[in-house]
Amino acid sequence: MEHMFPEREIENLFVKWIKKHIRNGNLTLFEEFFKTDPWIVNRCDKNGSSVFMWICIYGRIDFLKFLFEQESYPGEIINPHRRDKDGNSALHYLAEKKNHLILEEVLGYFGKNGTKICLPNFNGMTPVMKAAIRGRTSNVLSLIKFGADPTQKDYHRGFTAWDWAVFTGNMELVKSLNHDYQKPLYMHFPLYKLDVFHRWFKKKPKIIITGCKNNVYEKLPEQNPNFLCVKKLNKYGK
């Protein structure tokens, strides 16, 4: 008796197989499949991650350039807004990567077509927040340049990209935001946010703040390795 596989399972197995060749950098095979079925880039595995997402996750800029050459206009075939089961798009994954050039390539291409840069996932996390958490200063500035809103807040903690930069101790990013973008980015960072984070994640907060009003903070020599000591600065980071 023949074994019958659900269509969704077949789709998942196919994407897993393609994913393996993307990881190994087998562009020739991918080109052949693309010419047979261009919509292959939007096919998803069981987690909702599309082939285009996996190209971005693995940082295959050669695959990206090939795809962009095949379209008559940005978004003709590739759907950059497709999201996985957690609500993350390809931009969420690119924002976390160290390779800044891949993010610039995608933003420069889809930026012509007004791609939504601030699209949040199901927790309200936008790509610019993801980049701020990882400390990717270049990625944050690129996303803002293409229209991302660094003052947008996530759903659960009410953190902005600026709040995450302060919380994770990325003072280079904090200063860059306040120097380059004269928006109200020098928001308050109240102590209760640290208490909430401590209760939820059972971790010690990485930052000690003595004031709650509109302040920017810079890193000082640590007195305790478990904490980041800070001092008040003015709103321009000086």
From Swiss-Prot:
Q: ANK repeats span which residues?
A: 48-77, 86-115, 123-152, 157-187
- One biological process GO term for this chain? symbiont-mediated suppression of host NF-kappaB cascade
Report the main location listed first in the record: host cell
Q: How is it modified after translation?
A: The protein exists in a 28 kDa and a 32 kDa form, probably due to post-translational modifications which are neither phosphorylation, nor sumoylation.
- Which InterPro entries does its entry note? Ankyrin_rpt, Ankyrin_rpt-contain_sf
Where does it reside?
A: Host nucleus; Host cytoplasm
Induction of the gene: Expressed in the early phase of the viral replicative cycle.
Q: Where is this motif: PxIxITxC motif?
A: 205-212
Per the annotation, the residue ranges of the short sequence motif FLCV motif are 227-230
Q: Which domain of life is it from?
A: Viruses
On whether Ubl conjugation is a keyword of this UniProt record, the answer is yes
Alphabetical keyword list = ANK repeat, Early protein, Host cytoplasm, Host nucleus, Host-virus interaction, Inhibition of host NF-kappa-B by virus, Repeat, Ubl conjugation
Asked if the Swiss-Prot or TrEMBL record annotates the protein with the keyword Ubl conjugation, the reply is yes
User: Can you cite an annotated GO cellular component?
Assistant: host cell cytoplasm
**Where is the motif Nuclear localization signal annotated in this sequence?**
80-86, 202-213
The Swiss-Prot or TrEMBL note on domains reads:
The C-terminal region contains the docking motifs PxIxITxC and FLCV, which are required and sufficient for binding to host calcineurin.
Q: How does it assemble?
A: Interacts with host PPIA. Interacts with host PPP3CA/Calcineurin. Interacts with host RELA/p65; interaction of the 32 kDa form with host RELA results in the formation of a stable complex with NF-kappa-B. Interacts with host PPP3R1. Interacts with host EP300; this interaction inhibits the association of host EP300 with host RELA, JUN and NFATC2.
What is known about what this protein does?
A: I-kappa-B- (IkB)-like protein that inhibits the binding of NF-kappa-B to DNA, thereby down-regulating pro-inflammatory cytokine production. Forms a heterodimer with the NF-kappa-B subunit RELA/p65 and prevents the activation of the NF-kappa-B transcription factor. Also inhibits the host calcineurin phosphatase activity, which is required for the induction of nuclear factor of activated T cells(NFAT)-dependent immune response genes. Inhibits calcineurin function, which is required for the induction of nuclear factor of activated T cells (NFAT)-dependent immune response genes.
Q: Which family does it belong to?
A: Belongs to the asfivirus A238L family.
Identification of the protein by name: IkB-like protein
Q: What is the lineage of its organism?
A: Viruses, Varidnaviria, Bamfordvirae, Nucleocytoviricota, Pokkesviricetes
